[in-house]
């Protein structure tokens, strides 16, 4: 059983949307969202290299993942993953609180 830990950075409202997401992707960052439970949804960014490394293991899709956002740790499961149609790199990730 592998333990997955991803480091994320919270995004402000000015870093959300189509243009901002494209700028993040050019900087090798993946926009993501954490939602569910009693807490409000949190928009975050994850390093592309870190996410791709975790995706290499099939257990990533089945197990609870720890996402560190600042000093807070969220236990989540991946809900959806959007990939680029030609490059197959992750473009956006949805995480649901476990």
From Swiss-Prot:
Keywords: Ribonucleoprotein, Ribosomal protein, RNA-binding, rRNA-binding. Disulfide bonds: none annotated. It comes from the Bacteria. The keyword RNA-binding applies. The keyword rRNA-binding applies. Gene3D superfamilies: Ribosomal Protein L25, Chain P (2.40.240.10). One of its GO terms (molecular function) is 5S rRNA binding. GO terms for cellular component: cytosolic large ribosomal subunit. Pfam families: Ribosomal_L25p. InterPro entries: Rbsml_bL25/Gln-tRNA_synth_N, Ribosomal_bL25/Gln-tRNA_synth, Ribosomal_bL25_short, Ribosomal_L25_dom, Ribosomal_uL5_bac-type. Residues 1-22 are annotated as: Disordered. GO terms for biological process: translation. Part of the 50S ribosomal subunit; part of the 5S rRNA/L5/L18/L25 subcomplex. Contacts the 5S rRNA. Binds to the 5S rRNA independently of L5 and L18. Belongs to the bacterial ribosomal protein bL25 family. This is one of the proteins that binds to the 5S RNA in the ribosome where it forms part of the central protuberance. This is Large ribosomal subunit protein bL25. It comes from Acinetobacter baylyi (strain ATCC 33305 / BD413 / ADP1).
